[in-house]
């Protein structure tokens, strides 16, 4: 770290964002759009918002994050809607709480459009540079950054979004080189600066599969995976929707020969060979991990996905590996359809430094250094969507910090985004964190379709939702409310022709009469069925019809979950004293005292979600707080 009195600044900004990946772009755009003079520093101006692994956005829980970022005024959803190659709804046979939109994207088009957006954003400057040091003020607050070549920039807040570049090292077999990703050098010096400031850092690992030439594969031996006929959208803004021809993906499977090659050469893998000890992502394992962990499984699905419309590269999803390059081609050619494939880029593993996010407040500002924020993979997450969500949170709060406004904590019962940040800041995570629907106890309320209803009013209040978007939002909500009123008020009689037809076709009798809302509550009956009987409203958009149907069909479950939230919230939002020394609370278990003192939760709800803190500890803590408050009030009463 460098102290302010020894630095000459070249320029001054309100906010500096370090790293221009998916987190950095959201953070920089948010601060700039909120009126802060922002500098976005990146190692390579040609790799802004690059998708170094799977060029895709969405999937289970990740699509909810993408919708939520858009609802707040962010960019990732718009980008996916502009650049998709294929779109599919996953889990469509299940309830709306777990529906997941996934888009395969054109990675070069995605990066080019995002680069154009950040280059033309008012209040935002971009520059190629490697940040190696932080400049601190007299009170150990951040006041600037210094680059590898000795240039310093002044600022009031810094957002670190360094991805896999901090101390990055890529591995192919037992060969390694310093790099944040293939062909790009690692960031040096910043980890050492953070360690000197007292931050704990650790190492994590991830990987990416080989890329093959699409002209060298035989699709006839694979299973076709087409996109959905009805295209859905991540963004709530129709102006960014682009109707385009979809490209197919394909599926193949591993064979006994694939498994033999991997098992016989496990000792050549960087992890199984003992050269890399960093923990990899549990929910996106390498192919060698799959073979070891699922010994009884005879075959694994492998998806063959295009990386762009105008390039020959195919992404081999589910086949990431750190095995030697000369072995990788044999493995690829053991897959049906890839017997004669040409490998364009080898697979590799990458290990990198991260900061356990328990060192951050839920605002994503660090606890040790005022004005320093962290977002994305540096916080121990994996995935573009998780990174983008943290980026917009850090950007919003950095802008508010600069303006001396109260920073925003997103409660976990309000959004997946809030669940993500809350988990990161309260749980001692030692492996890359991926968002899952199962991580949210409120997932029935936190659906993709109502992300705007939950977050757009907040985005408007913050200043990221303009008048046009606000009008779109309010009209949609008015239409849904009006349609629900109509559905509750309109009745179908059993003796009407339409009533007889419905009873006959559904094999369910109508006794006297029934409201359209009660029809929608019936299993297997949907709004499209109302249309079939001339009972729908043709003036509504698909999103408005779906919103009304879901609210009515699941109203009982929604009300029950809302009641649970309110009950928990009565105690969960209770503030914990900042100066509370948990080691002195003898009624807490030893582990709870240690964990609580390390994390320093802001509320009872956060304390309850810390690993190692059980319900008995929470009860003991509540009793302690009551006794402390009583003692304080007694002391005040005794004063003359």
Swiss-Prot record:
Main location (coarse class): cytoplasm
Residues engaged in binding NAD(+): 280-294
SUPFAM superfamilies per the UniProt record, alphabetical: FAD/NAD(P)-binding domain
Cofactor(s) in the UniProt record: FAD
A GO BP entry: tRNA wobble uridine modification
Superkingdom classification of source: Bacteria
InterPro entries for the chain: FAD/NAD-bd_sf, GIDA_C_N, MnmG, MnmG-rel, MnmG-rel_CS, MnmG_C, MnmG_C_subdom, MnmG_C_subdom_sf
GO molecular function, one term: flavin adenine dinucleotide binding
Ligand binding (FAD): 19-24
Key word Transmembrane helix present: no
Compartment(s): Cytoplasm
Pfam families: GIDA, GIDA_C_1st, SAM_GIDA_C
Cellular component GO terms, alphabetical: cytoplasm
Record key words, sorted: Cytoplasm, FAD, Flavoprotein, NAD, tRNA processing
Function comment: NAD-binding protein involved in the addition of a carboxymethylaminomethyl (cmnm) group at the wobble position (U34) of certain tRNAs, forming tRNA-cmnm(5)s(2)U34.
Complex and partners: Homodimer. Heterotetramer of two MnmE and two MnmG subunits.
HAMAP family to which the protein is assigned, alphabetical: MnmG_GidA
Protein family: Belongs to the MnmG family.
Protein name (database record): tRNA uridine 5-carboxymethylaminomethyl modification enzyme MnmG
Gene for this chain: mnmG
